[in-house]
Structures are given as C-alpha cells and as structure tokens.
Amino acid sequence: MEFPTQPKLVDGKSIIYPPGVKEITDKISNDEVVKRLKMVVKTYMDMDQDSEEEKQQYLPLALHLSSEFFLRNPNKDVRLLVACCLADIFRIYAPEAPYTSHDKLKEIFLFITRQLKGLEDTKSPQFNRYFYLLENLAWVKSYNICFELEDCNEIFIQLFKTLFSVINNSHNQKVQMHMLDLMSSITMEGDGVTQEQLDSILINLISAHKNLNKQAFDLAKVLLKRTAQTIEPCIANFFNQVLVLGKSSVSDLSEHVFDLIQELFAIDPHLLLSVMPQLEFKLKSNDGEERLAVVRLLAKLFGSKDSDLATQNRPLWQCFLGRFNDIHVPVRLESVKFASHCLMNHPDLAKDLTEFLKVRSHDPEEAIRHDVIVTIITAAKKDLFLVNDQLLGFVRERTLDKRWRVRKEAMMGLAQLYKKYCLHGEGGKDAAEKVSWIKDKLLHIYYQNSIDDKLLVEKIFAQQLVPHNLETEERMKCLYYLYASLDPNAVKALNEMWKCQNMLRSHVRELLDLHKQPTSEANTTAMFAKLMTVAKNLPDPGKAQDFVKKFNQVLGEDEKLRSQLEVLISPSCSCKQADVCVRDIARKVANPKQPTNPFLEMVKFLLERIAPVHIDSEAISALVKLMNKSIEGTADDEEEGVSPDSAIRAGLELLKVLSFTHPTSFHSDETYESLLQCLRMEDDKVAEAAIQIFRNTGHRIETDLPQIRSALIPILHQKAKRGTPHQAKQAVHCIHSIFSNKEVQLAQIFEPLSRSLNADVPEQLVTPLVSLGHISMLAPDQFASPMKSVVANFIVKDLLMNDRSNGDKNGKLWCPDEEVSPEVLAKGQAIKLLVRWLLGMKNNQSKSANSTLRLLSAMLVSEGDLTEQKRISKSDMSRLRLAAGAAIMKLAQEPCYHEIITPEQFQLCALVINDECYQVRQIFAQKLHKALVKLQLPLEYMAIFALCAKDPVKERRAHARQCLLKNISIRREYIKQNPVSNEKLLSLLPEYVVPYMIHLLAHDPDFTKPQDIDQLRDIKECLWFMLEVLMTKNENNSHAFMKKLCENIKQTRDAQAPDDPKANEKLFTVCDVALCVVYNKSAPCHSESSKDPVLPLTFFTQPDKDFSSKSYITDEARNLLLTGKPKPMTVLGMVNKPLNATGRRPYSRSTGSEISNNVSINSESDASVANRQSSEVPEIGVSENDENPVRLISVPPAKTETVKNKEVNLDQTAPSNTGTERGKKRSAASAGAENIRKESEEKKADNISATPTPKPRRGRPPKSESQGSAAKNDETSKPSGRGRKRAAANQESSGAQEAANAKVPKQDSTAKKTAQRQIDLHR
C-alpha cells in the first residue's frame, strides 16, 4: 500500500497541486516534469481573477514555480511551461503579484523574456504555446509590474531587444500587434524612456539593421508612431546631447544621428519638432564635414515626396538654401544634387531654388556647374514643366562654358530634351513650344572654334535633331521641317557643317588618290600635308596626328580597306551602304585584346564625319516629293508650325545647299521636273534657288536629259533679261556652267540687253546691268571689246555722270533697301559692272582700269555726289560711297589692278571705314574682313582696321578687333602649314602690316598738326588698336621685329611726297609714337631682331641710314601719351567746333545701348559676318545716321542720353568753305559740349575766332565749292593728292581710247609720282 507523499512547504504553507497532478520535484524525469506542468498550465489557464478560493489554494504552487529548479531548468519545454504558468499567475493575481521580492520579480521577468525567444521559429510544435505566452503578457500588461523595480530598465531593454530580434516575415499580424502592445504599454505608462531603451528601438532604423530584418524596422516604425507623444522628449534630449552638446558617448548610436533623423522624419515629423532647430544650428557649424552631413540629411528631408518641411519650417529652409553658397565645395555640390529631387517632388519650391542655381551655374568649380546642368535636365526629362524657362536658360548659358565636360553635358542634355518633347511629341504642343529654341542654340555652337564642340554638334544633329536611323521618308520630313523652322544663324551653321564634312570628304578622297600614285618624295610630302589637314578636323589634333599617320599606314597595307573607304566617300554612296562601310572599317581597325582603343575612337570620329548618313539620291527624291506636296497644298506644313510658302522656300534653300555637297544625288528626271516647276513660280527666292541648283548639279543635263535642257534654256534666258538681279546673275552662271554652246547662249542675251539700255527708265536697268556685268566677267574674250563701248557711252557718260531725279531731302544717312531710288540702284550696279568687266579682262592694256579707279576716287571725293548738283539724297550718297569703296577693294584683289592703285586711292578707300554713316562703316568692314580672311587682299588692307579705333560705336570697334584677331591667326597658321618664300612672306606675315599702318595714319586727314597732343592721342589709339593684337604673344621675337620696322622707316622718306618736309615730319612723328607704344607694351628684351625688315617701296623710299635720327615727339608728349588722362572728347570729333555740312549730326563715342534700336550694332560671328550682304542692313529710324538728332553728354562722361527731338541748325555758323578742307570731313564728338570742355578752353576758343574753323568729317575729302574760299585756306591743311577739284575735270581729254573716262577727274598733274613698285605684296 502506497502512502501519498508529504506535501512540501513553501513559506510555511503546503503546496497543493491541481487534481491529478503529482508533486513536481527534481527527482523525476524531464518528461514527467513536462507532463505534470502541462496539467498545471491547464489549471492556471482556466482560472480567472474572481476565483479567490483557488487563488489562495494555489498560491504556494505559484511561489514554488518561481524556484531555482524551474527558472534555471535546462529543459526548454519545462521553461516554456513554467513561463506560461507564471504569465497566468500574473494575470490571476493582478494587479498585485504574489511575489514580493524585487529580486525575485526581476529574475522572473528576465526568465519570461528569455522564453519569448522561442517566438522566432513559427514552425516549432511549441509555437502556439509561445504565442499564448506573448498574448497573455501583452493583454495583462504584466511587465508594468516592473515599474516598481529600481532596475526595471534592464528588463525592458532585454524585452525590447528580444522582441525586435525574433520578429520575422513568417509572423502574422497578431504576433506583431501583441509585441507592439507589450512594448507600447511599457513606453507610454512608464515614467520615461531611458537612453538604452531608446537605443534598443532606434537601432532597428539604421540601414545595416534594416537590411537584415525589415520586420524589426517596421515594428519599430509603428511603435514610434504609436508612442510619438511620449517618446518625443526622449528623442529630443538624445539629439540635443549629441548635436548641441557634442556628447557622443551618451549612446552607441551617436554616429548615426543623421540617418536616424531621416528615418524618424519619414516615420513621423512630429518626433523631431524639437530637433529641427538644432539642425539649423548645425548648418552654421565651422566644421565643413559636419555641415556636409547636415546638408545631406536635410536634402533628403526637404526633397522627400510627401515632405512639407519647407513650408512648415521656413527658417530652416532659408538656412538650408544658404548652403548653396557654402565656402566648402562638397557642401555646394550636395546642395545642387538635392535640387533635382526637390524640383521633381516639390515644383512649388522651384522659385526659391532658381536664384541659388543661377549663382551655382557660374560656380568656379567645374563639378558644381556640371551638376547644376544634370539637376535641371533630370527634372526636365521627368516633366518639362517642372523647370521654368529661367532654369533652362542656365543650361543654355553653360553650352558656352570654358570646360568641355560642362559644355558637353549641357549640349547633350538639351538635345535629349529636344528629341523627347519636339521629335517624339511627348508633352504635347506646349512642351514642344517651350523647347523649340534648343535646335537653334545647339547649331549656333558650331560657330565655336573648338573642334570638340563642332564634332558634338554633328553627333547631336545625326542622333537627336535628325536621327539617321529613321526611314528615309521620315528622316527627310524631319530635316525638311527642321530646316524651315531654324533661325538664319542656325541655318548658316548647318550649311557650314555640311560644307566642313564635304571638305573633309574631299581631303580623304585626295589622300586615297595619293595612295594610287607611285611613291616619291613629292608624294610623301603631299601625303603628310594632307594627313595634317585631316588631323586638324579631329579631336585633340596633337594626338590625332599620330593616329592619322597610323591609319594611313593601315590604308597603305590593306587594299580592301582602301576600297571600302573609297565606297564610303564616293558621291554615289547610299546611306545604307555608308552604315555597312563604317561598321566594316571599324571592325578591321578594332583590336579585341584592347577594350579601350583610342585609335579606334579616332577612326570612328573620322568615319562619322565623312559618312553620308543623311543624304543620298533616295533622300533627295524624298525631299523633292515633300516640296511638291507643299506646292500642291497637301503637306502637313501647318501641323508642323510652318506656312506652305516658308516650307517651299526653305525646302529650295535646303536643296540648294545640298546641291553643293551632294550634286550627284540630284541627277534624275523627277527632281529636275520639280525644279522646273519651281522656276515658274512667282516667288523670286524660290526661282533663284532653283536656278542655283541647276547651276550646281546640271553638268550632265545636256547629254543625258535633252527634254529638261529644252525646257530650261528659255526660262534661263527670260530670267537673265527680266528676272530679279539675283536670278539674272544665277541664270548667266547657270548657262555658262552647264551648256557647251554657252557663247551662243550668252550672245543671245548680251546683244538685246546692250542695245536696249535706257538711262531714262532706271527701274528696268538693274537686271540688264547685272547680266551684262556677269557675262563680260565670265566670257571676257568674247564680250570685253563690245562692253567697252557700252561702258564709255552709256555707263559713264549717260548713267553715272547724270542725275535725272531729285533725292529725298529727309536728311537721313541711310534708308532701307526698298526705299532706295531706282536710279541709285542702277548706278550701284553700274559700278559693279565696271568691276566685273575689269575682273574678266585681268589686264590693263587699254588703261581702262586707271580710268575706272579715277572715277571711283572722284565718287569718294565728292561724297557720292559725282555730278555735284546736290540733287541726290544723303542716303543715296552713302550707298554710292559704299559702292565705290567696295569696288576699289574688289579690284585690289586682282594683282594686275592692285599694282596700279595709287597710295592716294588706297587712302581714300581706307577712309570709308570711318564714314559718317554707320551702315557704310559696318558693311565695308565686313567686306574687308571677308576678303582678307580668304587671303585675297594684299596685307596693306589689313592696316585699314587701325582706323576703327576712331569708330564711335563700341560694338564696331569690338567687331574690328575680332576681325584682326581672326586675320592674324589665319595668316600665322598659313605660314606654319605652308613654307613660303621671303617675297611671299612680305604679303603674309602679320607684323608687316605695321609700315602700311604708319603710312596710312601719317596721311590721315585729321592728322594736321604733328605736335598737337590731342591728335597724337588719336594716332596712338589707332596704333595701339592694331599693335595690341599683334603683340599679344612675342612669337619669334616679333616685338623686336616691329621695333626694327619702325626704326627702319625713320631711315626713309615718304614715297608719296619725298620732298615735302611736312609729310615726312608727320610720317616720322607717327613712327615715333609707334616706337613709344612698342617700347612701353613689349616685354623687356635685349635681343635684336635677326631679320632685317624690307619696306614697301610704294610707300617708302630706299633707306638712308643717316637720314633721320632725331625724336619727333617731346618727352612731355611721350609721358602724356603713355600715362596721361583720357581725352575729354570722343575720338571721332572735336567738341565745340561746328560742322561744315548743314545740319550734320555730330558723333559721340557711345555704348551699344545708347544707339537707337534701329541700328544693328551687335558684333557677329565670323560666319555671319562673311555672309552678310548690303541688302541685309536693317532699317533705321532716328539713329546715328540722322542729321538732326543730337547726342548730349552729361557730366559723368560714361553715361549719355539720346535727345530725339532737338535739332541743330548750322546754316548760320558754318561758312560755305567746305571745298577748302582737303581730306575727309570729321564729325564733332558731341553737342552739349559745355559738359565736357573746360570753361577756360571755351573762352579761349571764343577769343581766337568768332566763327571757328569747321573740322573735316571722317569719311571722304569734301568737294570744293568755290575757288575763292580755297585760296583762303592754310596750305598746310591740305593733304596732297586727294583728287582734283571739279573745276579741273573739264580739262580732261576724251579720246576714243579713254572714252570710259570722259568726265572722270584725274590726279593733280603737280602731284609727285610714286616710285616703281618693287615688292609684290599679293602674289
């Protein structure tokens, strides 16, 4: 018989187990312990708080379960069951726990916490019991009992760490909610959250932990949201300790404060209400790295999608924006990077960012400027309307950045925007309109000197503007409407691009031709020169030279490669063929073992430039069809934003340009039939372009297309006789180019036109004169003689020497082309006819050139009024002066005529650049530059630019300086690339312009008193205008060479007047001023020039080493010139001296903004300057060229105001003695001179003469009005050889041989003849 075991006593009370449960001791097995504990768990689970009897009964058992045996039992099942029992005990006995010892309570809760780790494995058979444990603890809030314990924090930290560590993605929502309830009750119901407890939560927000356990991160997020109000002060205290007080030791998370702030802000911005002011404090830290960290943080806070921090905390936002101007580069860089996200997520903040991005777009750091572009473009790609026009303007500016990386990013970014919104039409019409300017801007960049820029524009054009991979019809439609919508400068750039590509193709073609020739020294030299030319058309020409040589070597060794390259550059190569050839050649050159192959990259650059990827016969045919649709009215012109007329005109212009570069592609019946249809259209421009296309492409029409020939001939005859002047010119050239019986064809035009000339009907004269001039130039052998009688009897006697109509007396110096009188238009063409006739003959056997030059000189002397009847208007006189000056310059381009142009005639021509009319100066300077830059004019004509120092308009002076820079660089480059003889060197070396300039300035009509300091200042300004550009670099000891030039001049005499002491004194004085400038501006050098300069004998006598050694300017004058204050008057005029032409408007040196907006003053790029014709001169109203409006200069001389309604009448003050002033008239600097001249000077002037002597006007020598007044003038004021007075003109004989000069004034017979010209400065 078994007796029951005596119950064990706990606290003097016996332990009572539930029915059926035996005593649990350490004597039994673990399995038995587990079995008995499960029954105990069941008992406690079924009990509730109201069972007072049972609570008392099982109290000893509850105490027993907290014994060491259970709490430290090694069996996890035992521990789990005990934990469940203890949890139920806390539930049953709540709110008081049966355990009174704090140590015991702590031990129990740490034990329970350890058991919660079992929640980790959801597939465990015991998981439900673990879940019950968690649920029980959370529901009862059992852990709140620990608040009474002194070291409860240890329990809570352990609990939080346990729960965050066990949660995983296999847990359901209930598990997460119970964990959350458990932790939030502890957080919210306690007296506060300790730092360690806070750390146990925040650590789950750090990236490393977040990536390891996303569920822990989510749990922490929800916990912080739920307990935000309670936990916020603790968070604020933590960040205050770390950020403000710098106590990083308070937490292991101190180094992650900025990451934590970002995460907390994303969870709930209210958690950081007290932290944000601390960040503002940190933004102003002295530590750059610290500011950078804060900026990175705030960039994320402000830029996040749903953030309203910028509106909620304006002080912090403004402080953050201030970091865009931080002294620390990484901080500025980070600020700029942030802007992209901000623009995309918060468009309303774009206005705040714009000004700061503007400043950063000019940041000295390249990386920052680059990132500004990336920022704006990235936002614009997402949605164009996220960025305003001002931001896009910053990108536009950076296309001209000094750094290639920045320029490239800006250009590519804009190109991508254009393709997205204009080509693909994303964003609709509004978006396309917003970026429609991009195509023009990108093409304008082709004007830049950098080869990298040019190549990128070509790449952008081929890939973004007109993608070459489109089908032919689509590609040509894209090109057709692009060309029609480009601005004029962009069109010129695109034309230049095709021209450059075509030129490079021809260079490569010539290189291949050299490979076909037998090897020789001459062949090797020619090949090397060609390789250098090709290399200059590739990036980094220095390295490219080596690669081009290597490629040439490969070409020489690989015949198949040569044949493929020949196919690529052949005129008949199609676009598809070109793609295949480029791929094949690149594959052959590539080296598989070399991933980055600079040689291959260079070859690709070359192939991309020469490959015809856009235009072939099929493409031309597609373009013609598009144009036909526009003519028929069935095209999509209006939808593309182009009017049908504009589309047709642009289409013809496009075809015209392509006819130069791809003439073979035009040769088809269909194309020429369409062009014939265009010829019959009423639009003059369209017909003119069509004729030009026939001229460029029709060489095989006569043999291959007889029907086209039959239809074309009568049209060309009609255009040559009755078309517009431009059509007539093109028609004559077209006949001359494409027909074998051109002599017969031209005769059929020449004879009726020459017989029908009638000066009484000037409206019908212009076209015949154009046709006759070009016929005589193209076929001089046939028409030179019959033209001579036309010139003598009609052109000179009947047309030029008679005024049949009265001009408009409105006093303006210029008028629009459409307002020019027909008679003056005819006279202008008559002058051009004379020049073309002479250029055709290319000889002066009949002395017709001398007569013509005298006629042109007389035109300049008479200010354009050759008859001196005063019937012609001022604006018409300006036109004729320009025509005469341009004609002399044109003749000078032909060596046989250059030799007979006298120094006096050259000086008259030069003075046109100082004409009183703005447009005359402008157009003449453009023509001068165009001829010089092509090396067609002798070097002495470059000296004319020195006179531009006297131009009153700043932009004209700037343009002249650019012209000088361009000309000098071209000449120096030519000398480097082409070995030249010493004789040829005289006409090319830029430094040789110095003697011509000195001679020209010595004969300046304004230079009358060699010792007058004001006149010397003028001379010094002109000299420095040229010398500054020449002396930029001391290449090849050029400074010493120029000094030697000046010294040599002082050993000669003025060949124009060798026995005139006054003329020689002026020459030596100018020479001394030049030496003064050279000595002052050159770097100190003791070496002498190794070369002995040769002086042109046309202007200087043979050197006499003992002739002149004295100085012609005093030391005082020299000091004043070098260090004196600027003159108180403008260069072009003398203040307080009345004009000698009634009502003539005085000049004043002014800035561009002070000139009427009707005057074109913008200095243009070389490309546009070279193409600008006189017909493009803008219309002007009240402007520099009006006689009456006066420009007043106020006391501060830097500012001027235009007084439009004030008139000056000089009839009473200017005596009629203009004929006595030999040399050009010169405009007064300004009215209102009392604001500039000193009062003492005015009184002195008044005392000298009641009627001051009028100052000659810049531009031309004035005509004589009376012999009597001429006699009263001081002889010293007369420059020699300026053309005779009109009174002497009647003394000329009019023999048959000199019929062309019947009424043309000749040079004064008393003038000294110049020495035989010894040096050919042109050939």
Curated annotation (Swiss-Prot):
One of its GO terms (biological process) is mitotic sister chromatid cohesion. Residues 1235-1246 have a biased composition (Basic and acidic residues). Signal peptide: none annotated. Residues 1153-1165 have a biased composition (Low complexity). It is found in: Nucleus. GO terms for cellular component: chromatin; nucleus. Residues 1166-1176, 1210-1220 have a biased composition (Polar residues). SUPFAM superfamilies: ARM repeat. Keywords: Cell cycle, Cell division, Mitosis, Nucleus, Repeat. It holds the Pfam family PDS5. HEAT repeats lie at residues 385-421. The keyword Metal-binding does not apply. Residues 1139-1323 are annotated as: Disordered. May regulate sister chromatid cohesion during mitosis and couple it to DNA replication. Chromosomes assembled in the absence of pds5a and aprin/pds5b proteins have a mild defect in centromere cohesion in vitro. PANTHER family: ANDROGEN INDUCED INHIBITOR OF PROLIFERATION AS3 / PDS5-RELATED, SISTER CHROMATID COHESION PROTEIN PDS5 HOMOLOG A. Interacts with the cohesin complex. Binds chromatin in a cohesin-dependent manner. This is Sister chromatid cohesion protein PDS5 homolog A-A. It comes from Xenopus laevis.
